[in-house]
């Protein structure tokens, strides 16, 4: 006796079924599922204070420039206490060599 009935495309090979159900669609009812959808995080930027940084060794003219000027130098070239050219200090940050003031 053959293990498969003539309805091979509809029915897998197995024992002979009690009812001929080759033309009936296979319907399977599953239990309801619950899916939780998490929202993606949102980045909020609040306005805050604007902080500016300045080089620590930048000197702005003041009444103490005569006392401090003798200890300041730009790449080994001393800065005179009687006033100096700012290009000497600023050129240090631009990659060019400082010239004597």
UniProtKB/Swiss-Prot annotation:
GO terms for molecular function: structural constituent of cytoskeleton. It comes from the Eukaryota. GO terms for cellular component: intermediate filament. Pfam families: Keratin. Keywords: Acetylation, Keratin. InterPro entries: Keratin. The keyword Ribonucleoprotein does not apply. The modification N-acetylserine is found at residue 2. The avian keratins (F-ker, S-ker, C-ker and B-ker) are a complex mixture of very similar polypeptides. Belongs to the avian keratin family. This is Feather keratin Cos1-2. It comes from Columba livia. The lineage of its organism: Eukaryota, Metazoa, Chordata, Craniata, Vertebrata.
């Amino acid at each position: 006796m053959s293990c498969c009935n003539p309805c091979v495309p509809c029915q897998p090979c197995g024992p002979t079924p009690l009812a001929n159900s080759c033309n009936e669609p296979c319907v399977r009812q599953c239990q309801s599922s619950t899916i939780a959808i998490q929202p993606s995080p949102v980045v909020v930027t609040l306005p805050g204070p604007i902080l500016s940084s300045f080089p620590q060794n930048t000197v702005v003219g003041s009444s103490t420039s005569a006392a401090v000027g003798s200890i300041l130098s730009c790449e080994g070239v001393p800065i005179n206490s009687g006033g100096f050219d700012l290009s000497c200090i600023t050129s240090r940050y631009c990659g060019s060599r400082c010239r004597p003031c």
